[in-house]
Amino acid sequence: MIIKPRIRGFICTTTHPVGCEQNVKEQIALTKAQGPIANAPKRVLVVGSSSGYGLSSRITAAFGGGASTIGVFFEKAGTEKKPGTAGWYNSAAFDKFAKEEGLYSKSLNGDAFSNEAKQKTIDLIKEDLGQIDMVVYSLASPVRKMPETGEVIRSSLKPIGETYTATAVDTNKDAIIEASVEPATEQEIKDTVTVMGGEDWELWINALSEAGVLADGCKTVAYSYIGTELTWPIYWDGALGQAKMDLDRAATALNEKLSATGGTANVAVLKSVVTQASSAIPVMPLYIAMVFKKMREEGVHEGCQEQILRMFSQRLYKADGSAAEVDEKNRLRLDDWELREDIQQHCRDLWPQVTTENLKDLTDYVEYKEEFLKLFGFGVDGVDYDADVNPEVNFDVADI
């Protein structure tokens, strides 16, 4: 079939398998160009490995460190009539390129919150790798089905206390609007922590540990975003921030557990990037369009891949073997360049000046839209979008 982008809200409902494969290819090339990562882990599990930072982690581990990788994700395969999800095609492309390099790659597709996912992963590690040296936890799911009860819990992207009103961009109409978001109820806050907090990360590490599949010195990392006062009302000070604070709580508990065998657990605070997750958060697209332009001008812009490469090579697995620098909460900070005072001041000054008319001149909004479409495999250089493509792409993946 010939596949064109179809946008609904902040989701593109179609995906392009060849475009997704080309994206992965580019990320691999970027990783290889950096040269091998010294002291890199050799057996890596990535929970949430099909897009964004999770995919970048798997690519970095495999193509920067030569690691055997297991990826866990929840994606849909394409059919004769309908394309699959971008994450399916990303994972298929990763698997193809890893195997071409002679790297071990296996994937599990299903609900990572489930007990079955954890058990199947443990069985696979025991069978193929024995143990693992690194666990990356990178789930970005809006819902969680509780394994014991089957109850489905939903998260909320809402402020706490009062209605939040701010200048935002309507990405469908390319227009500046006033966005208002009602505050979360106590139950919504609690539910957001249940879905997006640290509990499931703990359940994963505890299950892996009890099964004896964590090697001595195993490191685990989960991803977070803090941002600045421009996004705090909806993010860090909102329901989502409560969940991210719960990740910090989990990291402390897990670090204590793993330190007994020479391991570590850290939250890595990353910069804002264009992902399906961030596009759903009010004000984030406008903020990203602003901050990207300034960071590009300053020569410090990074995408997912550059961020994770820096986390591996300059934080967790440094060439000299020294411990990673952390902040007062034991977090790895990769948002340091974004949070530079000159960059943030620029955004603060610019925010009130942006109008629908000057949006494309004052910010990198055009690039934001391009990056967004690229997530789904569209607008990628070197891809013929008028060519007939097969939406059915198979690879080495087992259903959970």
Curated annotation (Swiss-Prot):
It catalyses: a 2,3-saturated acyl-[ACP] + NAD(+) = a (2E)-enoyl-[ACP] + NADH + H(+). Its EC number is 1.3.1.9. The record marks 75 as: Plays an important role in discriminating NADH against NADPH. Keywords: Fatty acid biosynthesis, Fatty acid metabolism, Lipid biosynthesis, Lipid metabolism, NAD, Oxidoreductase. NAD(+) binds at residues 48-53, 74-75, 111-112, 139-140, 244, 273-275. It comes from the Bacteria. Substrate binds at residue 225. Pfam families: Eno-Rase_FAD_bd (PF07055), Eno-Rase_NADH_b (PF12242), Enoyl_reductase (PF12241). The active site is at 235 (proton donor). The keyword Nucleus does not apply. GO terms for molecular function: enoyl-[acyl-carrier-protein] reductase (NADH) activity; NAD binding; trans-2-enoyl-CoA reductase (NADH) activity. One of its GO terms (biological process) is fatty acid biosynthetic process. Pathway: Lipid metabolism; fatty acid biosynthesis. It is an enzyme of class 1 (oxidoreductase). Monomer. Involved in the final reduction of the elongation cycle of fatty acid synthesis (FAS II). Catalyzes the reduction of a carbon-carbon double bond in an enoyl moiety that is covalently linked to an acyl carrier protein (ACP). Belongs to the TER reductase family. NCBIfam families: EnoyACPredFabV, PRK13656.1. This is Enoyl-[acyl-carrier-protein] reductase [NADH].
